């Protein structure tokens, strides 16, 4: 079954939002359990029913997400996109797609790319909160998308430690955005609440975050492995080298294959110097 990117994104967002609501309900239930009165018993029963419903919803979204991941690349960039020297010139130079708001997204990345990359290298809650307090406009879906693209690029280069660092920050941004939606707030006004809960490691919240982070890292690895497999197939000779008179045909087909727009998928030319600087930054932050 084919799913549009909007369906994939909606599924991922709903899954995160459901996890957060589930954590909220669990915390409420734990709080009510500390009191012993008839009214509290009624509230506890209602909270338990809400918790059960959220658990069912979470399982349903997980099933949908699993179905999407089997047939689609769930919104990660394709090999073609990565083969455009994405991080040499920033991902604003990808082949343009006819989607609403594209111009605004490009303008946003042009303006904030360096700061997004800096945020992606932060590893401590306090540092991330302070940086977003300085640059609240970074709290946006454009930032989350850029971080996801960066994760995919890093894993394709087998820079696993950097990928895991950026994935952490991508999930941070995704959770903040979904928290804002569930509270009907501007994301720039509620990111402090996220960090407050994260730093306290309240029951339910931190577990939901860690679960989502592991899922993202697993999907990034799976996506990169699929891209490497496809690249290996494209590079495989169409004929064995000992076919004698067919050697000319083999060479011709090899030339055709190498001229294919996907042929260089394993010969990416990323901005090595910039990513070396990112690695140094991660070590010092």
From Swiss-Prot:
RNA-binding is among the record's keywords: no
Pfam families per the UniProt record, alphabetical: CDC37_M (PF08565)
Location of this chain's protein in the cell: Cytoplasm
Taxonomic superkingdom: Eukaryota
Cytoplasm among keywords: yes
Coiled coil region boundaries: 35-73
Main location as per UniProt: cytoplasm
Summary of the function given for this chain in its UniProt record: Co-chaperone that binds to numerous proteins and promotes their interaction with Hsp70 and Hsp90.
PANTHER family with a match to the protein in the record: CDC37-RELATED, HSP90 CO-CHAPERONE CDC37-LIKE 1
Name of the molecule in the record: Hsp90 co-chaperone Cdc37-like 1
Organism: Xenopus tropicalis (Western clawed frog)
């Amino acid at each position: 079954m084919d799913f549009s990117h909007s369906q994939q994104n909606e599924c991922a967002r709903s899954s995160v939002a459901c996890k957060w609501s589930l954590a909220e309900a669990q915390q409420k239930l734990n709080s009510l359990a500390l009191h012993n009165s008839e009214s509290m018993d009624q509230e506890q029963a209602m909270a338990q029913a809400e918790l059960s419903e959220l658990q069912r919803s979470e399982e349903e979204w997980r099933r949908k997400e699993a179905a999407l991941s089997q047939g689609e690349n769930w919104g990660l960039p394709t090999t073609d996109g990565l083969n455009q020297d994405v991080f040499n010139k920033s991902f604003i130079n990808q082949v343009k797609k006819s989607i609403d708001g594209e111009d605004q997204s490009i303008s946003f990345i042009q303006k904030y790319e360096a700061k997004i990359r800096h945020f992606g290298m932060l590893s401590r809650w306090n540092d991330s909160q302070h940086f977003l307090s300085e640059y609240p406009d970074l709290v946006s879906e454009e930032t989350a998308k850029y971080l996801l693209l960066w994760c995919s690029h890093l894993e394709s280069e087998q820079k696993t430690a950097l990928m895991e660092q950026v994935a952490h920050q991508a999930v941070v941004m995704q959770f903040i955005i979904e928290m804002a939606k569930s509270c009907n707030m501007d994301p720039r006004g509620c990111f402090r609440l996220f960090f407050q809960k994260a730093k306290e490691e309240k029951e339910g919240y931190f577990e939901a975050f860690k679960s989502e982070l592991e899922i993202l890292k697993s999907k990034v690895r799976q996506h990169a492995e699929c891209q490497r497999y496809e690249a290996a197939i494209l590079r495989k000779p169409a004929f064995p080298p000992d076919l004698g008179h067919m050697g000319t045909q083999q060479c011709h087909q090899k030339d055709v294959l190498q001229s294919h727009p996907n042929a260089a998928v394993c010969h990416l030319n990323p901005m090595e110097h910039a990513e070396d600087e990112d690695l140094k930054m991660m070590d010092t932050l």
